[in-house]
Regions:
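A generic, lipid-embedded transmembrane alpha helix
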Residues: 2-18
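Short aromatic-rich membrane-water interface segments that cap or initiate transmembrane helices
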Residues: 27-42, 155-169
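Hydrophobic cores of alpha-helical transmembrane segments in multi-pass inner/ER membrane proteins
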Residues: 39-56, 102-108, 166-182
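Membrane-interface capping segments at transmembrane-helix boundaries
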Residues: 61-62, 114-116, 181-189
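Hydrophobic, membrane-inserted alpha-helices
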Residues: 76-86, 103-108
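Membrane-interface helix caps and helix-loop-helix hairpins in membrane proteins
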Residues: 84-96, 114-118
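Alpha-helical transmembrane segments in multipass membrane proteins, preferentially the mid-helix core
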Residues: 103-122
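Hydrophobic alpha-helical transmembrane segments in multi-pass integral membrane proteins
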Residues: 136-151
């Protein structure tokens, strides 16, 4: 969990510094690390841990769920779609970086497919679909209050309720990075 958390904290701190988004101090405890509210830093550890639990439950309780050409095609298609988003919206930092980072990571998985045989794309897609339900509820509250304030000049201004559509892919990359690192763990027998 540490490498993705460090990556995201750096990304988040940079975007906060250049005003891609900001945090409303009325809703934070007032402790700041790396220019981010403490709650935001802790998010990058707590949320992936919960998401890995959901992913592992899918793996354990649904052993018949296997990676197929369909699940791999869906994930690869997401990579193509977000890369297209990055190219079209190259002048919008949130859209561009989120699309580019997720596309590169997905294509990296496919490039190293033989070495990353442990990755289970079907379980990832099902678990991420489940994760999106609480994500939409909590993120909807955070963006509606607003705890997190987005600079619309840096995203495509397409929202699901009050949530920028890029947040879905931002979260997907966070979960995907953690799942890949988790699956590389040694198996204890």
């Amino acid at each position: 969990m540490m490498p993705p958390a460090v990556f995201y904290i750096i990304w988040d701190a940079w975007f906060t510094k250049i005003n891609v988004w900001s945090f409303n101090p009325a809703y934070t405890v007032g402790i700041s690390l790396f220019g981010l509210p403490l709650e935001e830093v802790l998010f990058f550890f707590a949320v992936p841990y919960c998401c890995l639990f959901i992913y592992e439950c899918i793996r354990v309780y649904f052993p018949a769920l296997k990676t197929t050409v369909v699940s791999e095609t869906i994930l690869f298609s997401i990579g193509i779609a977000v890369l297209i988003m990055a190219v079209i919206f190259y002048d919008k930092k949130y859209s561009f970086c989120t699309g580019l980072f997720l596309a590169v990571f997905i294509f990296f998985l496919y490039y190293l497919k033989k070495k990353l045989q442990f990755f289970h794309s079907a379980a990832f897609l099902v678990s991420y679909g489940i994760i999106l339900l609480p994500f939409m509820a909590v993120n909807g509250v955070l963006t509606a209050l607003p705890v997190v304030i987005y600079n619309n000049a840096e995203n495509i201004s397409c929202r699901i309720f009050s949530i920028p559509v890029e947040d879905i892919f931002y979260g997907m990359l966070l979960v995907l990075m953690n799942v890949v690192l988790y699956e590389r763990r040694p198996v204890i027998k």
